Amino acid sequence: MNFLKKSLFLVLFLGFVSISFCDEEKRQDDDEGNEREEKKEIQEDGNQEERRDKPPAWVPGK
């Protein structure tokens, strides 16, 4: 019976450690994804400002 308790404790402990590592990696991946999205938004905002600064193109017939 004591052997079964130790085995069960070991399995649960290793499972907990495994889940902890997975959660940590997931958080890191999410952080990297958020940084990429922020960079894209900054670039898009910069492109919109450049478009506002340029006069509209000349269109013949107007």
Swiss-Prot record:
Signal peptide segment: 1-22
Region (Disordered): 25-62
Modified residues (Proline amide): P60
GO biological process, one term: defense response
Propeptide: 23-53
Protein name, per record: Tryptophyllin-1
Protein task: Myoactive. Has selective relaxing activity on vascular smooth muscle.
Lineage, highest ranks first: Eukaryota, Metazoa, Chordata, Craniata, Vertebrata
Cellular localisation: Secreted
Basic and acidic residues bias locations: 36-55
Residue numbers bearing the Hydroxyproline modification: P56
